[in-house]
Structures are given as structure tokens and as C-alpha cells.
Amino acid sequence: MKKLLCVVMALCLTMACALAEEAPALNWEDFAPALEAGGVTGQFYTFDEIAVAIWMPEGLNPVELTEEDVANGYIGYFAPDDQSAAVSIVYVDVNGMSLEDYTAQLESAGATEIEPGTVNGLPCVSYKLAEQDSVSIAFTTEAGYILEVTCTPLSVENAELVWGAVVASIQPAA
């Protein structure tokens, strides 16, 4: 419990610093030491479709995608055995839509707490969907696609910290 409290406090300080700026900037190098100090483990997964790597905490396991999932743009889905949480990674053709245009669509779709920022230098927009109890982050790509990572549930204890670490890990694959 003390390790988790240490991680929570360190991540809160990191997030407070990031949120103090006009456009929040998250960097994996800021989160990784706090996770390590707190004994929080996980591993990176690489998505070859977009040359991106994303860290998942231990206990979130890759779920095999169906043909329908793939047809709907899913390139990754992670959940614990009890299905009490999930992280989905979707890569969808939006015909070259800009991040600003995508943000406008989010507003009309009822998203809240829409916020532009950067993650490891990549421009993005984050938002929440109350009816889905989720937080998402979206990036545009040079190929005219949107990469969107959605984490749920958001309403459980420490969810924002865990999901914050997942989001902060999104980076170009080495």
C-alpha cells in the first residue's frame, strides 16, 4: 500500500506540473521512475500498423481480436481476466481530417473535458465520455488516420493515475 501511495503522490505531482501549462505535455520519462519506485510493473506492446508502442500495466492482457473487430479499426484490446477494465486501441481512416476538425466532432458528439496537448511530443486531444465512463486520447497520422486509445472505467479508485501512465507511454516504436 505504501508503494502505491508513493506512486500516486509522484504521479499527482507530475500531472499537476503538466496541467499547469497551457497545453498539457505528458512524457513517459516523467512517469516511468514513479512507477518503478512504486513497484508497478507492465510491458510495452508495439503496434506495427502505426509504429507506436504503448505500455500496459501487469494484469491487462491482450485480447484476441475478431475479424469484425479488425474491420472496425481495432488494432489492440487489453483487459484483465475478469473484464472489469479495458484499453482499446483503434486506428481509423478519417480521410485526412485534422486534429482540430476531429475536436469539433467530439464537441458535437457530447464529449467533455476536451483538451489539446502532446504526449511524448505527439500532438493529441484527450476527452471523456461520461456515458461510457471512459477517457480517450486521439492522434492524427500522416496517413490521414486517427489513432485513438480509450481507457475504461474512469470512475474506479486510482483509475486516472493508471490510465495516465498508459496514455503517457504512447510513443513512436523504436
Model-derived features: positions:
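Signature of long, low-cysteine stretches enriched in small and polar/charged residues
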Residues: T103-I146, P153
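Bacterial Sec-dependent N-terminal signal peptides
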Residues: K2-K3
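Second-shell loop/turn segments in exported
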Residues: F44-T46, V87-N95, I114, E148-E157
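N-terminal targeting sequences that direct proteins away from the cytosol to non-cytosolic compartments
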Residues: C6-L11, M15-A71, A143, T150-A174
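Short, conserved charged micro-motifs
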Residues: M97-D101
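Secretory pathway targeting signatures of secreted, lumenal, and periplasmic proteins
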Residues: T46-G96, A130-E131
